[in-house]
């Protein structure tokens, strides 16, 4: 069976922290699906289509990387894609508490699916999509926290 990892998230926007997790996980799997979650109950800065397009540009030319969208439970999406691994990044203890609880529920729902946690590199341990949006909204540079294509999109969004 092909080793496929699903890296789910809203990625609104995609950050260098997300990129670092993918870069480090890339050699470990035959395929990584970056699964952009669609949550109609949340107001997003970027549409799912915009997020997929930006992430696609970030990973242009990379082998083994696919970008997709999904709604519903991550474990159901994993089953649909024949993946037995959910990939998650952890920045701090607060991330661990939240992610651990979700991984336990996922294990109850789908015992065959494992959650793999990668610790954030120190350089990215403070970076979050929420913080990046807030800083960019106030006209400050976020170029060290996001890939270039995302930084350009943020400038366009907030310079209207």
Swiss-Prot record:
GO terms for MF: ATP binding; pantetheine-phosphate adenylyltransferase activity
EC number: 2.7.7.3
Pathway membership: Cofactor biosynthesis; coenzyme A biosynthesis; CoA from (R)-pantothenate: step 4/5
UniProt keyword Transferase present: yes
Top-level taxonomic group: Bacteria
EC class (word): transferase
GO biological process, one term: coenzyme A biosynthetic process
Alphabetized PANTHER family for the sequence: PHOSPHOPANTETHEINE ADENYLYLTRANSFERASE
Name of the molecule in the record: Phosphopantetheine adenylyltransferase
